[in-house]
């Protein structure tokens, strides 16, 4: 009887207890950024910051060589095609599985539409304002569409950061909308803002479509399809709508190459981030593109930056800080072993 008492039995040497982890390792395992936080950081550093260079560089290429948006779109799509080599090496179908091929093509079409509208808008309105309208519309539409289609809500802090970022965008673009010039110049400016809005709407809808795609090699497949659809839609228009225009000097070629590389990096990071975090929060964090575009608009393009632009940019940065700080929550992994 006494031998069966748990406190009198000696420890079984054949089943040693697992060694306890050091305190630093336990802290690292118990407290690390969640998937949503990782997604937002990827969207901020890999999506918003590189994308902020795309608008000013596109405008510089247009100023130097009168390079239309159609040629810019074609050049960007060309950077997507080498991804086919990666898919071939992995043995994956280039166009994706047959059962989801329609949605993958639809996402590629929406992505090309968003890019084309963005490149067209930046040629008639300041780069910062075009990015502002596009990101603002994508954020609002993402919040509404996700709430209606996926019933995925947001916390109070998320809503605070989301509405604050939209307020910052209104502060930036509002004065310019109220002072549109009359005549043909005002019409072109209004058309540019309209294109930026449509581009943001297409972006938000495309992100929701991408979240519904679940298959191996999803990201490289849709990246290749975006380039393929963009070329198939743009190359015929190159000979129908206008005579082909090529960059005329080395700086123009450099701008075009930088646009293609930075846009591909931003596309990859945003597509990854939207699978980890709420689409509206991803779009809100992407408002960092607006701040970068305004800085480059002033220092590279030597365009005027109004005081309202500076105030709005500060509000946007503060809102991004709120969203990021709230989502920097710690996620416990594993349970305490007895």
Swiss-Prot record:
<dbReference type="GO" id="GO:0016020">
    <property type="term" value="C:membrane"/>
</dbReference>
<keyword id="KW-0472">Membrane</keyword>
<feature type="transmembrane region" description="Helical">
    <location>
        <begin position="67"/>
        <end position="87"/>
    </location>
</feature>
<feature type="domain" description="EamA 2">
    <location>
        <begin position="272"/>
        <end position="325"/>
    </location>
</feature>
<feature type="transmembrane region" description="Helical">
    <location>
        <begin position="190"/>
        <end position="210"/>
    </location>
</feature>
<keyword id="KW-0677">Repeat</keyword>
<feature type="transmembrane region" description="Helical">
    <location>
        <begin position="310"/>
        <end position="330"/>
    </location>
</feature>
<feature type="transmembrane region" description="Helical">
    <location>
        <begin position="221"/>
        <end position="241"/>
    </location>
</feature>
<feature type="region of interest" description="Disordered">
    <location>
        <begin position="1"/>
        <end position="25"/>
    </location>
</feature>
<comment type="similarity">
    <text>Belongs to the SLC35G solute transporter family.</text>
</comment>
<feature type="transmembrane region" description="Helical">
    <location>
        <begin position="255"/>
        <end position="275"/>
    </location>
</feature>
<feature type="transmembrane region" description="Helical">
    <location>
        <begin position="160"/>
        <end position="180"/>
    </location>
</feature>
<keyword id="KW-1133">Transmembrane helix</keyword>
<feature type="transmembrane region" description="Helical">
    <location>
        <begin position="105"/>
        <end position="125"/>
    </location>
</feature>
<feature type="transmembrane region" description="Helical">
    <location>
        <begin position="40"/>
        <end position="60"/>
    </location>
</feature>
<protein>
    <recommendedName>
        <fullName>Solute carrier family 35 member G6</fullName>
    </recommendedName>
</protein>
<dbReference type="InterPro" id="IPR000620">
    <property type="entry name" value="EamA_dom"/>
</dbReference>
<keyword id="KW-0812">Transmembrane</keyword>
<dbReference type="Pfam" id="PF00892">
    <property type="entry name" value="EamA"/>
</dbReference>
<feature type="transmembrane region" description="Helical">
    <location>
        <begin position="281"/>
        <end position="301"/>
    </location>
</feature>
<feature type="domain" description="EamA 1">
    <location>
        <begin position="49"/>
        <end position="174"/>
    </location>
</feature>
